[in-house]
């Protein structure tokens, strides 16, 4: 993106999109109230790379885990993101989520397709939501 993060002409969503660009390391995952569960999506150190509205997730060895697109809406509170995976069991599904960008941390909570978008930054057993924390 050729535009600057602080450009007052940009919408809040465009500024957040610019801030997301590049690579982020996964530092934690909570799924259904379980911290860092086994499985591919719980891999600490997995790298997510954002380019425009496209994302790619790779293991520390470089194997492709997941990819797709996303749409941000920073005009609502909490800020909303909708993920659409292009591979795997959720391929083509729109996954409602919320996010926050705090310095070098990107935190988001995603629900399953058809579920309500999360409304707070907290998950627990039986909620079928995932909290992911990524760091630059």
Which sequence ranges carry the predicted segments?
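Edge beta-strand at a domain terminus
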Residues: 4-12, 70-72, 78, 113-136
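N-terminal helix-cap/turn-to-beta initiation motif at the start of protein domains
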Residues: 9-25
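Contiguous, well-ordered beta-strand patches that form the walls/edges
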Residues: 26-39, 53-120
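A short beta-loop-beta micro-motif enriched in histidine and acidic residues
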Residues: 41-44, 125
């Amino acid at each position: 993106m050729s535009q600057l993060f602080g450009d007052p002409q940009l919408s809040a969503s465009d500024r957040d999109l610019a801030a997301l660009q590049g690579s982020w390391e996964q530092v934690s995952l909570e799924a259904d109230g379980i911290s860092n569960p086994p499985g591919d999506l719980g891999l600490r150190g997995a790298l997510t790379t954002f380019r425009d509205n496209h994302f790619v997730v790779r293991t520390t060895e470089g194997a492709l885990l997941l990819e797709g697109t996303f749409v941000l809406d920073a005009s609502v509170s909490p800020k909303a993101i909708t993920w659409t995976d292009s591979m795997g069991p959720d391929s083509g599904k729109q996954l409602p989520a919320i996010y926050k960008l705090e310095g070098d941390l990107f935190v988001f909570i995603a629900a399953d397709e058809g579920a309500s978008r999360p409304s707070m930054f907290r998950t627990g057993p039986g909620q079928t939501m995932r909290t992911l924390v990524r760091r630059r």
